[in-house]
Amino acid sequence: MMRFMTPFKHARNVLILFLSLLGLTLMMLFGSPWLALRSAFMPRSERQAYVRRAITTGYRRYFTTLHFFNVFHLDLTELDRLRGDDGLILTANHPSLFDALLIISRLPNVVCIMKAQVLRNVMFGHGAKMAGYIPNDSIRNIVNEAARELEEGSQLLLFPEGTRSRRGRINPFQGTVGLIARRTGCPVQTIFIESDSGFLGKGWPFWKAPDFPVRIRVRLGQRFSPGDDSKQFIAELQHYYEQELAPPACSTHRADDARTSASRP
């Protein structure tokens, strides 16, 4: 149902959007040099762990602030159950640009796969590079680096769709998670991100303010054991996500009834 927005509320939401994105940009812009200075003389493994913890702390404080000021209503507590589960592949649906940040804000030993051009960015990529995040430059490198990180006890975060989805849809899954799971034998923990808004999803302009607060819930799903057939594994995984994220039958019936009523003279 559409929520009516007065001009005053719209202006307020635009201001909230601007300040929220500005705060995130400044945190990422100045956080990397600060982390580089603090960890300059640490051994590689110690530096990586320190930077990951610092990134988790930074994002957690950021989202706590947004929650406090009624920008987001967040329910992320189920993610805390995964702390200490080493060598675990995490898969999640991808409804918005905030998805990876939300998960990282609760799990301090997560490694992500990022666009190579972002990792090469001097302003925004240095912190991610220090954290050991993996560039998506080639499948071979992704699989090899992911296997090494999982063997060392990291948790690997993947979005099987490969890109953000439009609200209410699931994009076709890519095969990377199946290749990594088969190569490493690590279990795959499914994660579901649910929101009442399409904010920063596929096709959502940066300048468009939603009706705040945006409500987001992250919940855990089934944990899968990898199979020998990667394609079959991916097909089963996608089918599971489609089932879990399908709208309730009653909602579908109401929408059908509304369309039928609207078509009557």
Q: Where in the sequence are the language-model features?
A:
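Membrane-anchoring hydrophobic helices of lipid-metabolizing enzymes
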Residues: 1-88
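Non-catalytic C-terminal accessory region of glycerolipid acyltransferases
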Residues: 3-7, 142-265
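Catalytic core of membrane glycerolipid acyltransferases/transacylases, capturing the structured
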Residues: 32-57, 69, 84-138
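Short gly/ser/thr-rich secondary-structure transition/capping motifs
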Residues: 69-77, 136-140, 200-203
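Short glycine/serine/threonine/alanine-rich loop segments
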Residues: 72, 133, 186
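Thr-Gly-centered strand-to-loop micro-motif
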Residues: 77, 114-115, 137, 160, ...
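Structural alpha-helical scaffold elements that stabilize or flank donor/cofactor-binding regions
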Residues: 82, 127-128, 149, 180
